Amino acid sequence: DKGKSYIEHQATQNGTSYKAKLKAAIDRFLPACSDLEELLRRLDSHEDLYTRANAAAHFTASAWVVSPDRSQVLMAYHKLYDSWAWLGGHADGDRDLLAVALREVREESGLTEVRPVSEDLYSLEILTGAGHEKHGRYVSSHLHLNVTYLLEADPAAPICPKPDENSRVGWFSPEDA
């Protein structure tokens, strides 16, 4: 099992596939909504949803990062969208979407210690990725099949933006986030 994530290892031990585990997590998510139904439909379609090779729709994973006392929320000012938002990014072939969310928070904020509050989904949504230029090439509009996890980090820990993606990173009160 070397090289497998904790969740993949647990799924293998329990005799379930990672896809089945993700479907079960999405199925348990409440409130039920049309995005949930569409995510389940696409998972059943046997499309490659974990890489950007699927130009129409692919998985992204995000994180709502809170302080241990829940008085602050970490946000990044994303250059592409010209707005403050929660942190996250593309799965890029990784089927462990919690690991993707953790990786993206570390990359986009400079935090070295961040931990899941729970392995359950915090939210799920289908987001439209507008057409844009990336690395000198045009990327057509597409769908981000996004799952969000609730993570926790210490607001006293050093943070810094990832200059190619965001210009600022900061902690906000939940009301301001």
Identify the residue ranges that each predicted region occupies.
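A short beta-strand motif that forms part of the nucleic acid-binding face
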Residues: 78-80, 90, 165
